[in-house]
């Protein structure tokens, strides 16, 4: 993987990731949003439909694909690309966050994490080394280190111990990744909770080990938005300029804009797909809750500014009808639209950075959805 920083507008970065794959070179323009394909599918969508929304890279879940269908099935198809028939780049998470989500069903030790398989109930063990091996078999283009996602709230001591263990796990991940002679990219993950000094130590430790990119982890786990913005604004300037930066599991359209304002290049979130299935649709001036009875007779498209298949062909009344009847097509059309909304947003962001008018774009974006522009920490401190 190669990263090229092309231009900036304030702290916002316009770049390009290039991946060499068996079927040729693939380019990902950044800032980029990655749709989530937890079980090797973006729910309800074919790979061609996902690509048609403008997505250039997907996210897969190591933890879920390891438990089902397992490494052997994956290897029998070549890798995850062959299994799901998506030939572009794939980033896989390490399984750390899913294990974190199991709560009382897991036990964290220095060696790794023992937990109860949520499918079969049997005890299984996941370590940094095992995570690297699974991701190697998945053929991931971007492999994430195995870390502990520090919960919120966490005391300073808990966050410190957790971050220090994540650094030791980062080194073990790096060592096993190198032993496997994996030609792909490996990203480090910054932890440290909401404590700036811990975030700084985490960044220094990761940069010392050396990675192809850096993710900011342990955010969007329940902390207030202001806290997330503060930590992001503190952390991103510490990261190497010549490597991509990834904000994990975030989020709403506003979160993407705020992340880019603070120097983030990559995002993923289940929000556009999950919300689509619940009739919660993102449009240029905010949100349409398609289950609202006022749409029953509405013959206008979802978003007149949108060029997706759904908006070009169907009315709000039809989408309301499909949802009311529980038709699968409703969820599919909604998903096509939400994913296209996110990709259009990223394209607009990239263009604004190229034209060095990103600050103006931010003002326009918030004006459209009827919200105030949140101040940057640097502005608050003036």
Curated annotation (Swiss-Prot):
Cite the active-site annotation. 93 (proton acceptor), 268 (nucleophile)
Biological processes per GO annotation = queuosine biosynthetic process; tRNA wobble guanine modification; tRNA-guanine transglycosylation
Q: Which species does this protein come from? A: Actinobacillus pleuropneumoniae serotype 5b (strain L20)
**Short name of one Pfam family for this protein?**
TGT
The membrane-spanning stretches of this chain are: none
UniProt record similarity statement: Belongs to the queuine tRNA-ribosyltransferase family.
Record GO terms (molecular function) = metal ion binding; tRNA-guanosine(34) queuine transglycosylase activity
Q: What is this protein called?
A: Queuine tRNA-ribosyltransferase
Tell me the keywords, alphabetical order: Glycosyltransferase, Metal-binding, Queuosine biosynthesis, Transferase, tRNA processing, Zinc
Catalyses which reaction(s): 7-aminomethyl-7-carbaguanine + guanosine(34) in tRNA = 7-aminomethyl-7-carbaguanosine(34) in tRNA + guanine
InterPro entries reported for this sequence:
ArchSynthase1/Queuine_TRR, TGT, TGT-like_sf, tRNA_ribo_trans-like
Lineage of the native species? Bacteria, Pseudomonadati, Pseudomonadota, Gammaproteobacteria, Pasteurellales
Q: Where is this region: RNA binding?
A: 249-255, 273-277
Query: What are its cofactors?
Result: Zn(2+)
Q: Where does Zn(2+) bind?
A: 306, 308, 311, 337
């Amino acid at each position: 993987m190669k990263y090229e920083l092309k231009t900036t507008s304030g702290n916002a970065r316009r770049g390009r990731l290039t991946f060499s794959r068996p079927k040729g070179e693939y380019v990902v323009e950044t800032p980029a949003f990655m749709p989530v394909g937890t079980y090797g599918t973006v729910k309800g969508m074919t790979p061609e439909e996902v690509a048609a929304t403008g997505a250039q890279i997907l996210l897969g879940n190591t933890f879920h694909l390891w438990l089902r269908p397992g490494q052997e099935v994956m290897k029998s198809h070549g890798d995850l690309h062959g299994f799901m028939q998506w030939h572009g780049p794939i980033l896989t998470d390490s399984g750390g966050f899913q294990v974190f989500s199991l709560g009382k069903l897991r036990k964290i030790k220095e060696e790794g994490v023992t937990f109860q398989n949520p499918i079969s109930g049997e005890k299984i063990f996941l370590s940094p080394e095992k995570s690297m091996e699974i991701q190697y078999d998945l053929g991931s283009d971007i492999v994430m280190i195995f870390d502990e996602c520090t919960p919120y709230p966490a005391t300073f001591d808990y966050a410190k111990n957790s971050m220090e263990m994540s650094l030791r796990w980062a080194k073990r991940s790096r060592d096993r990744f190198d032993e496997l002679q994996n030609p792909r990219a490996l990203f480090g993950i910054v932890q440290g909770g909401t404590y700036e000094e811990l975030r700084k130590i985490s960044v220094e430790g990761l940069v010392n080990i050396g990675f192809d990119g850096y993710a900011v982890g342990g955010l969007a786990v329940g902390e207030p938005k202001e806290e997330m913005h503060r930590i992001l604004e503190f952390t991103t300037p510490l990261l190497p300029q010549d490597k991509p930066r990834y904000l994990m599991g975030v989020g709403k359209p506003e979160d993407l804009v705020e992340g880019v304002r603070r120097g983030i290049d990559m995002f993923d979130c289940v929000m556009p797909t999950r919300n689509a299935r619940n009739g919660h649709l993102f449009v240029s001036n905010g949100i349409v809750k398609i289950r609202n009875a006022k749409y029953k007779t509405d013959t206008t498209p979802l978003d007149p500014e949108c060029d997706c298949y759904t908006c070009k062909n169907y009315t709000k009344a039809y989408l309301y009808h499909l949802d009311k009847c529980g038709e699968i097509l409703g969820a599919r059309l909604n998903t096509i639209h939400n994913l296209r909304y996110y990709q259009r947003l990223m394209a607009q962001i990239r263009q604004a950075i190229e034209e060095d008018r990103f600050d103006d774009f931010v003002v326009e974006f918030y004006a459209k959805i009827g919200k105030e522009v949140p101040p940057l920490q640097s502005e608050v401190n003036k």
